[in-house]
């Protein structure tokens, strides 16, 4: 069963990220601190006629890291070439990409923490001094070739900044921590999306939808699509607060934005392990999910909302989790 709160990109669905993506900083809703900083750094680079320093964007999935990379490129008026860590399997793959860059271009690497170390090491001299040395041939006939690169900006995006090596992380002069969105910003995003796609929704409905979107624009837009379907078939096509409540209840998305998998995690901890501590591996087996999936997709929001704690001995369900799910709490 597909997870309605899944953060995966929506592919060819109507509400594509590309269609909804703002083009410039003034169009970008939320992330005010990051926007304020980037506006200064971008303007300074333009006045000096220099490439922007390398940028690392990090935070949970679905918070607009890719969108921010495109916005930076538009603000600078430069081209952006896009790839991802898993797609760059060999050093030669990265060399080919770097060799195509024009002065001032942006190279955007999504999931940069998943690059192989052999590939990552090629970036060190490229980022610091704009050159690469590559070996061609084998054995006694091998030789090193020095390639100068034009000044460029590398933008790396990651959900796991802690997995970056120290040498790579140190070469990013600018960092942007993308945080979960506030309710008012998500409400504005929902209303903007509704306007773009000519969906009739009242303000209270947009606010309710925003409250249950896990602080994540991608999820808010996906839920809007599902609620629109519900309103079209069950109602008169207009999304009201009542329609929103009924649709999200049908989708098992509760008032805190937790879906059936989030609730399954917490119920498993409470019912089987007295609230914990329980190890991540054990918990993952019990709910039939991959360990990395639990750690990267589910835990951050549960922790941020105060339902879950990470301790040295394992995961622990909080008193708030007990209260939210209707379990009596015993402080052991």
Swiss-Prot record:
<feature type="binding site">
    <location>
        <position position="20"/>
    </location>
    <ligand>
        <name>ATP</name>
    </ligand>
</feature>
<dbReference type="InterPro" id="IPR041445">
    <property type="entry name" value="AAA_lid_4"/>
</dbReference>
<protein>
    <recommendedName>
        <fullName>Holliday junction branch migration complex subunit RuvB</fullName>
        <ecNumber>3.6.4.-</ecNumber>
    </recommendedName>
</protein>
<dbReference type="Pfam" id="PF05496">
    <property type="entry name" value="RuvB_N"/>
</dbReference>
<feature type="binding site">
    <location>
        <position position="315"/>
    </location>
    <ligand>
        <name>DNA</name>
    </ligand>
</feature>
<feature type="binding site">
    <location>
        <position position="62"/>
    </location>
    <ligand>
        <name>ATP</name>
    </ligand>
</feature>
<dbReference type="InterPro" id="IPR008823">
    <property type="entry name" value="RuvB_C"/>
</dbReference>
<dbReference type="GO" id="GO:0006281">
    <property type="term" value="P:DNA repair"/>
</dbReference>
<keyword id="KW-0378">Hydrolase</keyword>
<keyword id="KW-0547">Nucleotide-binding</keyword>
<feature type="binding site">
    <location>
        <position position="310"/>
    </location>
    <ligand>
        <name>DNA</name>
    </ligand>
</feature>
<comment type="similarity">
    <text>Belongs to the RuvB family.</text>
</comment>
<dbReference type="GO" id="GO:0016887">
    <property type="term" value="F:ATP hydrolysis activity"/>
</dbReference>
<keyword id="KW-0234">DNA repair</keyword>
<dbReference type="GO" id="GO:0006310">
    <property type="term" value="P:DNA recombination"/>
</dbReference>
<keyword id="KW-0963">Cytoplasm</keyword>
<feature type="binding site">
    <location>
        <position position="218"/>
    </location>
    <ligand>
        <name>ATP</name>
    </ligand>
</feature>
<keyword id="KW-0238">DNA-binding</keyword>
<comment type="function">
    <text>The RuvA-RuvB-RuvC complex processes Holliday junction (HJ) DNA during genetic recombination and DNA repair, while the RuvA-RuvB complex plays an important role in the rescue of blocked DNA replication forks via replication fork reversal (RFR). RuvA specifically binds to HJ cruciform DNA, conferring on it an open structure. The RuvB hexamer acts as an ATP-dependent pump, pulling dsDNA into and through the RuvAB complex. RuvB forms 2 homohexamers on either side of HJ DNA bound by 1 or 2 RuvA tetramers; 4 subunits per hexamer contact DNA at a time.</text>
</comment>
<feature type="binding site">
    <location>
        <position position="312"/>
    </location>
    <ligand>
        <name>DNA</name>
    </ligand>
</feature>
<dbReference type="Pfam" id="PF05491">
    <property type="entry name" value="RuvB_C"/>
</dbReference>
<feature type="binding site">
    <location>
        <position position="66"/>
    </location>
    <ligand>
        <name>Mg(2+)</name>
    </ligand>
</feature>
<feature type="binding site">
    <location>
        <position position="65"/>
    </location>
    <ligand>
        <name>ATP</name>
    </ligand>
</feature>
<feature type="binding site">
    <location>
        <position position="66"/>
    </location>
    <ligand>
        <name>ATP</name>
    </ligand>
</feature>
<comment type="subunit">
    <text>Homohexamer. Forms an RuvA(8)-RuvB(12)-Holliday junction (HJ) complex. HJ DNA is sandwiched between 2 RuvA tetramers; dsDNA enters through RuvA and exits via RuvB. An RuvB hexamer assembles on each DNA strand where it exits the tetramer. Each RuvB hexamer is contacted by two RuvA subunits (via domain III) on 2 adjacent RuvB subunits; this complex drives branch migration. In the full resolvosome a probable DNA-RuvA(4)-RuvB(12)-RuvC(2) complex forms which resolves the HJ.</text>
</comment>
<dbReference type="GO" id="GO:0048476">
    <property type="term" value="C:Holliday junction resolvase complex"/>
</dbReference>
<dbReference type="GO" id="GO:0009378">
    <property type="term" value="F:four-way junction helicase activity"/>
</dbReference>
<dbReference type="GO" id="GO:0000400">
    <property type="term" value="F:four-way junction DNA binding"/>
</dbReference>
<feature type="binding site">
    <location>
        <position position="171"/>
    </location>
    <ligand>
        <name>ATP</name>
    </ligand>
</feature>
<feature type="region of interest" description="Large ATPase domain (RuvB-L)">
    <location>
        <begin position="1"/>
        <end position="181"/>
    </location>
</feature>
<dbReference type="GO" id="GO:0005737">
    <property type="term" value="C:cytoplasm"/>
</dbReference>
<dbReference type="InterPro" id="IPR008824">
    <property type="entry name" value="RuvB-like_N"/>
</dbReference>
<dbReference type="InterPro" id="IPR004605">
    <property type="entry name" value="DNA_helicase_Holl-junc_RuvB"/>
</dbReference>
<dbReference type="InterPro" id="IPR027417">
    <property type="entry name" value="P-loop_NTPase"/>
</dbReference>
<dbReference type="GO" id="GO:0005524">
    <property type="term" value="F:ATP binding"/>
</dbReference>
<feature type="binding site">
    <location>
        <position position="67"/>
    </location>
    <ligand>
        <name>ATP</name>
    </ligand>
</feature>
<keyword id="KW-0227">DNA damage</keyword>
<feature type="region of interest" description="Small ATPAse domain (RuvB-S)">
    <location>
        <begin position="182"/>
        <end position="252"/>
    </location>
</feature>
<dbReference type="InterPro" id="IPR036388">
    <property type="entry name" value="WH-like_DNA-bd_sf"/>
</dbReference>
<feature type="binding site">
    <location>
        <position position="291"/>
    </location>
    <ligand>
        <name>DNA</name>
    </ligand>
</feature>
<keyword id="KW-0233">DNA recombination</keyword>
<feature type="binding site">
    <location>
        <position position="181"/>
    </location>
    <ligand>
        <name>ATP</name>
    </ligand>
</feature>
């Amino acid at each position: 069963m597909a997870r309605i709160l899944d953060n995966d990109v929506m592919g060819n669905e109507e509400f594509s990220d590309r269609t909804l993506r703002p083009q410039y900083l003034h169009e970008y809703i939320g992330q005010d601190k990051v926007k304020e900083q980037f506006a200064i750094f971008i303007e300074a680079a333009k006045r000096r006629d220099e490439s922007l320093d390398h940028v690392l964007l990090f935070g949970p999935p679905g918070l607009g890291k890719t969108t921010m990379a495109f916005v930076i490129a538009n603000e600078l008026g430069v081209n952006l070439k896009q790839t991802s860590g898993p797609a760059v399997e060999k050093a030669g793959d990265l060399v080919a990409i770097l060799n195509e860059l024009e002065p001032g271009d942006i190279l955007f690497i999504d999931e940069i923490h998943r690059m192989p170390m052999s590939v990552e090491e090629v970036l060190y001299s490229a980022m610091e001094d704009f050159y690469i040395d590559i070996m061609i041939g084998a054995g006694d006939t091998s030789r090193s070739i020095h390639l100068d690169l034009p000044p460029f900006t590398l933008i790396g995006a990651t959900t796991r900044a802690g997995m970056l090596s120290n040498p790579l992380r140190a070469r990013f002069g600018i960092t942007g921590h993308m945080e979960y969105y506030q309710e008012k910003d998500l409400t504005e995003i929902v209303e903007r999306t509704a306007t773009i796609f000519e969906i009739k929704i009242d303000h209270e409905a947009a606010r309710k939808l925003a409250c249950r979107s896990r602080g994540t624009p991608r999820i808010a837009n996906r839920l809007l699509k599902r609620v629109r379907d519900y309103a079209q078939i069950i109602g008169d096509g207009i999304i009201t607060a009542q329609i929103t409540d009924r649709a999200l209840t049908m989708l098992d998305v509760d008032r805190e934005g937790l879906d059936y998998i989030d609730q399954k995690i917490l119920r498993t901890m409470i019912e089987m392990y007295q609230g914990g501590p329980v190890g991540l591996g054990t918990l993952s087996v019990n709910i039939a999910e991959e360990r990395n999936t639990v750690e990267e997709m589910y835990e951050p929001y549960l922790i941020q909302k105060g339902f879950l704690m990470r301790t040295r001995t394992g995961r622990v369900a909080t008193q708030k989790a007990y209260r939210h799910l209707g379990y009596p709490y015993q402080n052991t």
